């Protein structure tokens, strides 16, 4: 840039230097039309050729120059070079000159022959008349700041021409405003109108020009520098904090990886220990099963023609009990025979002749025949006299001896009866143990034939331990959830590979429906469903809550029945769960309530219960359910017939209508079975027989056996549940409010006045006596 400036023509250098160092005042008349010209045109750097003073006509060059306003009478001021107005003619007027607002005080100029090697020309100090101290000082500072423009241009040669022009124009604006405020600007024949125009221009320039001074700029620069230092310090602090956080994150990541590795090792060790424990339990179960095979019995394969069937053979425990029963029976027969003989020797009462027995009559007939015949030898005489001696010995038994012998025989019979009862109780206990043994044998057989017997981990989460049971198309395994660290029950649904795709789809749809119903349920008396996932195209799994105990059906098979308090507690919990199922939206009918679907948490009848198996549940949505008639039974024939009401067996053109009263009937049947140890309808019948003989359709009234003794309130409750017509049967809401199931009402009755308590006790005693 500097090389380009030095290579310019000296006249152009003078022109460029004059643009930034000197501003002339027009000698021509005031032209109002040129007052709207921008002052920035003074510093414009157009490349267009301009008319210089050398190119002007001679008449203009020979004209005598008027004295400048700042020249005194004694002489002229410091000589100046050509004015900037001599080099430019404005488009606003025909004659050369400037507007009145462009008059500024003259400053020292460099001669046209001044070289650019001296960029800072000498500045002539001129007094500023008519200004106060601050204004004069400000004008002096503004005049002193003018030569800095060339120094900036030379110090920063890379600035473009437009930026230099803008800076020069800004300095010109400052000088114009200062000159307009001075009294010298009002001379040379200017009118008041021109002064007002100058004031307006000055105000306009003050509005667009910054008022910042060097001190303010320095202060701003210092503040900006301090702010910049603060920002840089803050940035450094943030960078250090970021580095610290990154270091902490790296440490946490390493620690997390370490903990993950440790957790994986713990999970691996847990799996190893669980598998080892499961194997030990399996071995113990198989050893016990082998021992029970000899004691309780086992299955043997028997051939019948071309087929083989399994036949049960009792063990030595049953054989010993059977032998003891045979011994007791033989002893009882012997005692009965001796009692008959003792009855023959019973002495007659006082004053009565002993009645002739059959033996005496036979002997008398024999003696009469012997008298007619002659004796042949002495042996015949002994034979004839022996019965006579026996008859005399029978007559010699006294009454005391007879009663003594009779008492002995009674005691012996009582002892045998007691032994027989003990043997019968032991036999029943062995039968229950045998049922468990048979169940365990089947479980072991199914487990050995299962494809999941080697402790696989399903879905990378559930470790299978051992088989709990097997149904028609599913297997239930006890498993361990490695993620939640809890035991669960995994139900594996396996479809038959020979099924058609349509049947598989229906089964899968049915299972998904059960999953959707069960997944939304959350009640303490309902088994929770945790998860659902697929294994392959023919199998999928549902993960359920695990309960240690057995179901109610197993308990009833072991104990036959239970007390009324225990049965009532179970029924209260079942009704509580049914109430929840009917309060949710949409309500749900379980439809398959039975002892096998009621789990005892701790295996006893005095604990908590949970309801499971929602495979046949019915959703009572608005589309299919009517509050008056109920909903159509689309799955007629499904379910357990002993626990279904009569309306489920009605056959007609349209499907039967059902409601939540189906579950109420099931509650009544379960309560009856818990109290009496048998089902109220079709106890010893199969489901096929119940269907063929219409057993449930004929169950118009329930009958109660005399034993065991049950309270009338319990019987009335069962009758309300087992009403034949569904219109007469109570629903679930009424069942939950039944007086028999409300403890506070029963307590209030029992804790009433003493007279009332006495009346209640006497009425209860009379009811018990009548029921007996």
Curated annotation (Swiss-Prot):
Q: What is the effect of changing residue 493 to R?
A: In MRD57; reduced kinase activity
Question: What residue ranges carry the coiled-coil annotation?
Answer: 225-276, 317-347, 403-451
Q: Which Gene3D superfamilies match?
A: Transferase(Phosphotransferase) domain 1 (1.10.510.10)
> Record's GO cellular component, any one?
perinuclear region of cytoplasm
Q: Which Pfam families match?
A: Pkinase
Q: Name one GO molecular function term.
A: protein serine/threonine kinase activity
Q: Where does ATP bind?
A: 468-476, 491
Q: Per the entry, which co-factors are needed?
A: Mg(2+)
Places the protein is found: Nucleus; Nucleus, Nucleoplasm; Cytoplasm, Perinuclear region; Cytoplasm, Cytoskeleton
Query: Which segments show compositional bias classed as Polar residues?
Result: 29-44, 367-380
Q: What is the effect of changing residue 339 to Q?
A: In MRD57; uncertain significance
Phosphoserine found at? 73, 94, 99, 115, 117, 134, 750
**How is the activity of this chain controlled?**
Cell cycle-regulated, with maximal activity in the S-phase. Rapidly and transiently inhibited by phosphorylation following the generation of DNA double-stranded breaks during S-phase, probably by CHEK1, possibly at Ser-750. This inhibition is cell cycle checkpoint- and ATM-dependent.
Name the reported effect of residue 617 to A: Increase in autophosphorylation
Modification after translation, per record: Phosphorylated at Ser-750, probably by CHEK1. Autophosphorylated; phosphorylation promotes the assembly of higher order oligomers and enzymatic activity.
Domain (Protein kinase) ranges = 462-741
- Describe what happens upon changing residue 686 to D: Reduced kinase activity
Chief location of this protein? nucleus
- Tell me what the record says results from residue 173 to L: In a gastric adenocarcinoma sample; somatic mutation
Result of changing residue 297 to D: In MRD57; uncertain significance
Protein's job: Serine/threonine-protein kinase involved in the process of chromatin assembly and probably also DNA replication, transcription, repair, and chromosome segregation. Phosphorylates the chromatin assembly factors ASF1A and ASF1B. Phosphorylation of ASF1A prevents its proteasome-mediated degradation, thereby enhancing chromatin assembly. Negative regulator of amino acid starvation-induced autophagy.
Which protein is depicted? Serine/threonine-protein kinase tousled-like 2
Which gene name belongs to this protein? TLK2
């Amino acid at each position: 840039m500097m090389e380009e400036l030095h290579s310019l023509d000296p006249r152009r250098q003078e022109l460029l230097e004059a643009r930034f160092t000197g501003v002339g005042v027009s000698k021509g008349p005031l032209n109002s039309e040129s007052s709207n010209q921008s002052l920035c045109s003074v510093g414009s750097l157009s490349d267009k050729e301009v008319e210089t003073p050398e190119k002007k006509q001679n008449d203009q060059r020979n004209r005598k120059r008027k004295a400048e306003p700042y020249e005194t009478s004694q002489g002229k001021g410091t000589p100046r070079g050509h004015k900037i107005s001599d080099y430019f003619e404005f488009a606003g007027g025909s004659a050369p000159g400037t507007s009145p607002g462009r008059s500024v005080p003259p400053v020292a100029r460099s001669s046209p022959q001044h070289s650019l090697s001296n960029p800072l020309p000498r500045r002539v100090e001129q007094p500023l008349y008519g200004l106060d101290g601050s204004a004069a000082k400000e004008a002096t500072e503004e005049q002193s700041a003018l030569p800095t423009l060339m120094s900036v241009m030379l110090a920063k040669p890379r600035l473009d021409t437009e930026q230099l022009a803008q800076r020069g124009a800004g300095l010109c604006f400052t000088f114009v405003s200062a000159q307009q405020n001075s009294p010298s600007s009002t001379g040379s024949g200017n009118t008041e109108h021109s002064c007002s125009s100058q004031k307006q221009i000055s105000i306009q320039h003050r509005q667009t020009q910054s008022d910042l001074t060097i001190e303010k700029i320095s202060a701003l620069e210092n503040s900006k520098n301090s702010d910049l230092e603060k920002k840089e310090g803050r940035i450094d602090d943030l960078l250090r904090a970021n580095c610290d956080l990154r270091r902490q994150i790296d440490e946490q990541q390493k620690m997390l990886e370490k903990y993950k590795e440790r957790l994986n090792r713990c999970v691996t060790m847990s799996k190893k220990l669980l598998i080892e424990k499961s194997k030990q339990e399996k071995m113990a179960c198989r050893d016990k099963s082998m021992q029970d095979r000899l004691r309780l019995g086992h299955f043997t394969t028997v051939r019948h023609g071309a087929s083989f069937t399994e036949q049960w053979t009792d063990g030595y425990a049953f054989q010993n009990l059977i032998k003891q029963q045979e011994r007791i029976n033989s002893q009882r027969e012997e005692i009965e025979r001796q009692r008959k003989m003792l009855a023959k020797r019973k002495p007659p009462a006082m004053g009565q002749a002993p009645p002739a027995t059959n033996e005496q009559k036979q002997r008398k007939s024999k003696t009469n025949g012997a008298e007619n015949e002659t004796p042949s030898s002495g042996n015949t005489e002994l034979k004839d006299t022996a019965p006579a001696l026996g008859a005399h010995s029978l007559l010699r038994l006294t009454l005391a001896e007879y009663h003594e012998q009779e008492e002995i025989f009674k005691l012996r019979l009582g002892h045998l009866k007691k032994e027989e009862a003990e043997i019968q109780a032991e036999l029943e206990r062995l039968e229950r143990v045998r049922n468990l043994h048979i169940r365990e044998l089947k479980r072991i057989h199914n487990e050995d034939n299962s494809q999941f017997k080697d402790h696989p981990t399903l879905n990378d989460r559930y470790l299978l331990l051992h088989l709990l049971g097997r149904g028609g198309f599913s297997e239930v395994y006890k498993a361990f959830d490695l993620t939640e660290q809890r035991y669960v029950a995994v139900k594996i649904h396996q479809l038959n590979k020979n099924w058609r795709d349509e049947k598989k789809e229906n089964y899968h749809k049915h299972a998904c429906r059960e999953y959707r119903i069960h997944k939304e349920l959350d009640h303490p008396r309902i088994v929770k469903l945790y998860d659902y996932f697929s294994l392959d195209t023919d199998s999928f799994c549902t993960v359920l809550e695990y309960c240690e105990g057995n179901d109610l059906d197993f308990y009833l098979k072991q104990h036959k029945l239970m007390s009324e308090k225990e049965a009532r507690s179970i029924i209260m919990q079942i009704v509580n769960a049914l109430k929840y199922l009917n309060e949710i939206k949409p309500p749900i009918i379980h439809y398959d309530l039975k002892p096998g679907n009621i789990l005892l948490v701790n295996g006893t009848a005095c604990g908590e219960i949970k309801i499971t198996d929602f495979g046949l549940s019915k959703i009572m949505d608005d589309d299919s359910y009517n509050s008056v008639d109920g909903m159509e039974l689309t799955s007629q024939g499904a379910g357990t017939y002993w626990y279904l009401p009569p309306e489920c067996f009605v056959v007609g053109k349209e499907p039967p209508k059902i409601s939540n009263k189906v579950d109420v009937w099931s509650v009544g049947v379960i309560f009856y079975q818990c109290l009496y140890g048998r089902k109220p309808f079709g106890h010893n019948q199969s489901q096929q027989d119940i269907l063929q003989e219409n057993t449930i359709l004929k169950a118009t009234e329930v009958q109660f056996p005399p034993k065991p003794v049950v309270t009338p309130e319990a019987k009335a409750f069962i009758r309300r549940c087992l009403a034949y017509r569904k219109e007469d049967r109570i629903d679930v809401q009424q069942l939950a409010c039944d007086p028999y199931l409300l403890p506070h009402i029963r307590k209030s009755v029992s804790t009433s006045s003493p007279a009332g308590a006495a009346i209640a006790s006497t009425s209860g005693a009379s009811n018990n006596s009548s029921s007996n």
